[in-house]
């Protein structure tokens, strides 16, 4: 059985500093979803506070975020926006 993969649409990356998350769209198993990764996750991955550089940090950790997105989606596939939080880290 093939493992689901999150294909992130890089054109949709948006830093929502008010909510402290980077929002984006992605596709898993040919279905499109809205995602957001919290700043806390970006900081845990990079060991750097993401203020002002959140999208750059996101790009540096793209593969890890894609993996975490699949985990977050499996946790609750019916969310309007799938939020990747520290709970999704190993």
Question: What is the predicted role of each segment?
Answer:
Residues 7, 12, 41-44, 88:
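Residue-level preference for alpha-helix termini and adjacent loops
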Residues 2-5, 49-90:
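Acidic, low-complexity intrinsically disordered segments
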Residues 1-27:
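Short, charged/polar N-terminal "headpieces" of proteins
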Residues 21-46:
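A short, structured beta-strand/loop element
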């Amino acid at each position: 059985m093939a493992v689901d993969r999150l294909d992130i649409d890089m054109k949709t990356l948006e830093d929502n500093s008010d909510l402290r998350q980077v929002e984006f769209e992605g596709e898993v198993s040919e279905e499109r979803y809205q995602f957001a990764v919290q700043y806390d996750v970006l900081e845990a991955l990079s060991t750097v506070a993401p203020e002002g550089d959140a999208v750059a940090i996101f790009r540096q950790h793209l593969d890890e975020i894609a993996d975490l997105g699949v985990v977050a989606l499996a946790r609750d596939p019916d969310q309007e926006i799938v939020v990747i939080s520290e709970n999704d880290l190993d």
